[in-house]
Amino acid sequence: MFKRKSTAELAAQMAKLAGNKGGFSSEDKGEWKLKLDNAGNGQAVIRFLPSKNDEQAPFAILVNHGFKKNGKWYIENCSSTHGDYDSCPVCQYISKNDLYNTDNKEYGLVKRKTSYWANILVVKDPAAPENEGKVFKYRFGKKIWDKINAMIAVDVEMGETPVDVTCPWEGANFVLKVKQVSGFSNYDESKFLNQSAIPNIDDESFQKELFEQMVDLSEMTSKDKFKSFEELSTKFSQVMGTAAMGGAAATAAKKADKVADDLDAFNVDDFNTKTEDDFMSSSSGSSSSADDTDLDDLLNDL
């Protein structure tokens, strides 16, 4: 059941999580999402809940890569969730090609994406009142994550008091406000309210009811949820095509593709109607030398 925990313990758990940035999990019915109106605005009151396991943090961090290229999708969990950047073909592709510094567009497409997960109690949901009083998984971004951290990482010397927002007795409700700003969802007005206990939390039967609705978030990041490097590499190559080779190999492959396209476009009928004089005149000049140079370059690249 629920136990009181120190804010220092929560701070240590969150710091450990932050070191292993983690983002993909498929859609499931246990996830709560704020319903927005036609203008893209919405609000609700939620309560972040503690972990089901006292030894684990009340949050989970997932990293994924999700993008579409050459008409194909790549959506997979990234091993950097566990601090392992070598077992992800996309991370290797980014690193080997130094995409962050050399190709901002490509980097923006394939970069790691981080999502944060928590168990929450829905306190007030005006757009879907049937959710009130129920426990769900909730996925959120860095803006809200920073607001949670700000409640813990306070300046004690200045008289500020750290708050474990997940504590059922001394935590705080969170007012989630989303507004559409320049085409994007903005969470700036979201905030924690004053510390308060969850109503009826001292009732053991109520505690049990909440506890049984919660999920073990550690299962979301367990290594059996991540595919092998070989399997991911195959998928990545299928999506990326020759670009997955990187460097000179990719350039050479593009040249080879162009040669193949040129051969496909060759008109045999035109060839059959050319006279001996046509061939003699077309062979003069520097075109033959240029073609030989291109071919040499292609072979060298390969």
Swiss-Prot record:
<comment type="function">
    <text>Single-stranded DNA-binding protein that participates in viral DNA replication, recombination, and repair. Coats the lagging-strand ssDNA as the replication fork advances. Stimulates the activities of viral DNA polymerase and DnaB-like SF4 replicative helicase, probably via its interaction with the helicase assembly factor. Together with DnaB-like SF4 replicative helicase and the helicase assembly factor, promotes pairing of two homologous DNA molecules containing complementary single-stranded regions and mediates homologous DNA strand exchange. Also promotes the formation of joint molecules.</text>
</comment>
<feature type="compositionally biased region" description="Acidic residues">
    <location>
        <begin position="291"/>
        <end position="302"/>
    </location>
</feature>
<dbReference type="InterPro" id="IPR012339">
    <property type="entry name" value="Phage_T4_Gp32_ssDNA-bd"/>
</dbReference>
<feature type="binding site">
    <location>
        <position position="65"/>
    </location>
    <ligand>
        <name>Zn(2+)</name>
    </ligand>
</feature>
<dbReference type="GO" id="GO:0006281">
    <property type="term" value="P:DNA repair"/>
</dbReference>
<feature type="region of interest" description="Disordered">
    <location>
        <begin position="273"/>
        <end position="302"/>
    </location>
</feature>
<keyword id="KW-0238">DNA-binding</keyword>
<feature type="binding site">
    <location>
        <position position="88"/>
    </location>
    <ligand>
        <name>Zn(2+)</name>
    </ligand>
</feature>
<keyword id="KW-0479">Metal-binding</keyword>
<dbReference type="InterPro" id="IPR044947">
    <property type="entry name" value="Phage_T4_Gp32_ssDNA-bd_sf"/>
</dbReference>
<dbReference type="GO" id="GO:0039686">
    <property type="term" value="P:bidirectional double-stranded viral DNA replication"/>
</dbReference>
<keyword id="KW-0862">Zinc</keyword>
<feature type="compositionally biased region" description="Low complexity">
    <location>
        <begin position="280"/>
        <end position="290"/>
    </location>
</feature>
<dbReference type="InterPro" id="IPR046395">
    <property type="entry name" value="SSB_T4"/>
</dbReference>
<comment type="similarity">
    <text>Belongs to the Tequatrovirus single-stranded DNA-binding protein family.</text>
</comment>
<keyword id="KW-0678">Repressor</keyword>
<dbReference type="GO" id="GO:0003697">
    <property type="term" value="F:single-stranded DNA binding"/>
</dbReference>
<feature type="binding site">
    <location>
        <position position="91"/>
    </location>
    <ligand>
        <name>Zn(2+)</name>
    </ligand>
</feature>
<keyword id="KW-0235">DNA replication</keyword>
<keyword id="KW-1194">Viral DNA replication</keyword>
<keyword id="KW-0227">DNA damage</keyword>
<dbReference type="GO" id="GO:0006310">
    <property type="term" value="P:DNA recombination"/>
</dbReference>
<protein>
    <recommendedName>
        <fullName>Single-stranded DNA-binding protein</fullName>
    </recommendedName>
</protein>
<dbReference type="GO" id="GO:0006260">
    <property type="term" value="P:DNA replication"/>
</dbReference>
<comment type="subunit">
    <text>Homodimer in the absence of DNA, monomer when binding DNA. Interacts with the DNA helicase assembly protein; a ternary complex between the helicase assembly protein, the single-stranded DNA-binding protein and ssDNA is an obligatory intermediate in the helicase loading mechanism. Part of the replicase complex that includes the DNA polymerase, the polymerase clamp, the clamp loader complex, the single-stranded DNA binding protein, the primase, the DnaB-like SF4 replicative helicase and the helicase assembly factor. Interacts (via C-terminus) with the viral SF1 dDA helicase.</text>
</comment>
<dbReference type="Pfam" id="PF08804">
    <property type="entry name" value="gp32"/>
</dbReference>
<keyword id="KW-0234">DNA repair</keyword>
<dbReference type="GO" id="GO:0046872">
    <property type="term" value="F:metal ion binding"/>
</dbReference>
<feature type="region of interest" description="LAST">
    <location>
        <begin position="3"/>
        <end position="7"/>
    </location>
</feature>
<dbReference type="InterPro" id="IPR012340">
    <property type="entry name" value="NA-bd_OB-fold"/>
</dbReference>
<feature type="binding site">
    <location>
        <position position="78"/>
    </location>
    <ligand>
        <name>Zn(2+)</name>
    </ligand>
</feature>
